């Protein structure tokens, strides 16, 4: 894990960060979620075209390539891609990237500490909703954090074949998770609303976390549907059978969830189980399905 020098924020950077603390995150997020579900015909199509132009969204790779094909903004935002738009790495000993976006940070978990950004760390225990048993499985392991910008494909896929063991919904803040805020809001990913998914794999346990953010109106999984809303004030755990008819088995590259606006995906791997591709450093663009790591365990 490479440590970068911590720069003292400027006055305007401090103002920008302070605004995040007073910004009405939940009301604005609820309003955004409601607006994104409205069917306003030509108005909706105009908004989609404007958004796509502003953020340089590549609609040509989507199954529906015209703004007028979408009834709501959310339908556009979680648009499925054309078949083979994201080829899945076929090496049986390789993991694939779970999402389009950019690497926020990646590297080794130092005991139980993960690097959030320049000068900021957070712990496995706080990230995993104080589940000490789960946290112990990933001490001295590896992690990768992927930031999904507004222009990106917002469905999240599996890096490997896996069986679901547990899902935890964690209520929390809705800070923006862009790279600037990641550098200036302590414990950002351990404070924000999130959905923690623990899986069994051939190399041991693996966790994939969907982290919410401002205007991330909802997160969903393929096995449970929309997780939020409704939003609760308590941590909620769901346990799953790992065999039998009710077991949830997912294949490498298979869709596992989606964001309706936002956000960030964090993956955790146990000690001495994988070796990341050397180029996957902070700021590097990612494409779902490309090689993430080699299984070494």
UniProtKB/Swiss-Prot annotation:
Site entry: Cleavage (non-hydrolytic): 262-263
Function (record text): Catalyzes the formation of phosphatidylethanolamine (PtdEtn) from phosphatidylserine (PtdSer).
Matches recorded under InterPro entries: PS_Dcarbxylase, PSD-B, PSD_type1_pro
Annotated pathway: Phospholipid metabolism; phosphatidylethanolamine biosynthesis; phosphatidylethanolamine from CDP-diacylglycerol: step 2/2
Protein name stated in the entry: Phosphatidylserine decarboxylase proenzyme
Cofactor note: Binds 1 pyruvoyl group covalently per subunit.
Keyword Lyase: yes
Superkingdom, natural source: Bacteria
Similarity comment: Belongs to the phosphatidylserine decarboxylase family. PSD-B subfamily. Prokaryotic type I sub-subfamily.
EC number(s) reported in the record: 4.1.1.65
Residue(s) carrying Pyruvic acid (Ser): 263
Cofactor(s) needed by this chain: pyruvate
Keyword GTP-binding included in the entry's annotation: no
Gene coding for it: psd
Catalytic activity: a 1,2-diacyl-sn-glycero-3-phospho-L-serine + H(+) = a 1,2-diacyl-sn-glycero-3-phosphoethanolamine + CO2
Record key words, sorted: Cell membrane, Decarboxylase, Lipid biosynthesis, Lipid metabolism, Lyase, Membrane, Phospholipid biosynthesis, Phospholipid metabolism, Pyruvate, Zymogen
Subunit structure: Heterodimer of a large membrane-associated beta subunit and a small pyruvoyl-containing alpha subunit.
Gene Ontology terms: cellular component: plasma membrane
PANTHER family noted in UniProt: PHOSPHATIDYLSERINE DECARBOXYLASE (PTHR10067), PHOSPHATIDYLSERINE DECARBOXYLASE PROENZYME, MITOCHONDRIAL (PTHR10067:SF6)
Primary location: membrane
């Amino acid at each position: 894990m490479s440590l970068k020098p911590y720069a003292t924020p400027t006055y305007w950077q401090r103002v920008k960060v302070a605004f995040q603390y007073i910004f009405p995150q939940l009301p604005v997020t609820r309003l955004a979620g409601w607006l994104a579900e409205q069917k306003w015909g030509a108005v909706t199509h105009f908004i989609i075209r404007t958004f796509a132009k502003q953020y340089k969204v590549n609609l040509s790779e989507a199954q529906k390539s015209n703004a007028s094909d979408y009834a709501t903004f959310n339908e556009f935002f979680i648009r499925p891609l054309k078949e083979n738009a994201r080829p899945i790495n076929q090496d049986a000993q390789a993991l694939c990237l779970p999402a389009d976006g950019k690497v926020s940070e990646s590297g080794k978990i130092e005991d139980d500490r993960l690097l959030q950004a320049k000068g900021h760390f957070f712990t496995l225990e706080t990230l995993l909703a104080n589940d000490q048993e789960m946290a112990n499985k990933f001490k001295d392991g590896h992690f990768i954090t992927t930031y999904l910008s507004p222009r990106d494909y917002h469905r999240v896929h599996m890096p490997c074949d896996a069986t679901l063991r547990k899902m935890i919904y964690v209520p929390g803040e809705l800070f923006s998770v862009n790279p600037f805020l990641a550098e200036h809001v302590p414990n950002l990913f351990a404070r924000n609303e999130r959905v923690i998914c623990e899986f069994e794999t051939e190399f041991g346990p693996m966790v994939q976390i969907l982290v919410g953010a401002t205007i991330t109106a909802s997160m969903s999984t393929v096995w449970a549907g929309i997780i939020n809303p409704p939003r609760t004030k308590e941590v909620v755990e769901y346990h799953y059978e790992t065999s039998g008819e009710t077991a949830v088995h997912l294949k490498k590259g298979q869709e596992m969830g989606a964001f309706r606006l936002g956000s960030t995906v964090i993956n955790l791997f146990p000690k001495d189980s994988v070796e990341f591709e050397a180029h996957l450093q902070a700021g590097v663009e990612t494409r779902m399905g490309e090689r993430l790591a080699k299984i070494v365990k």
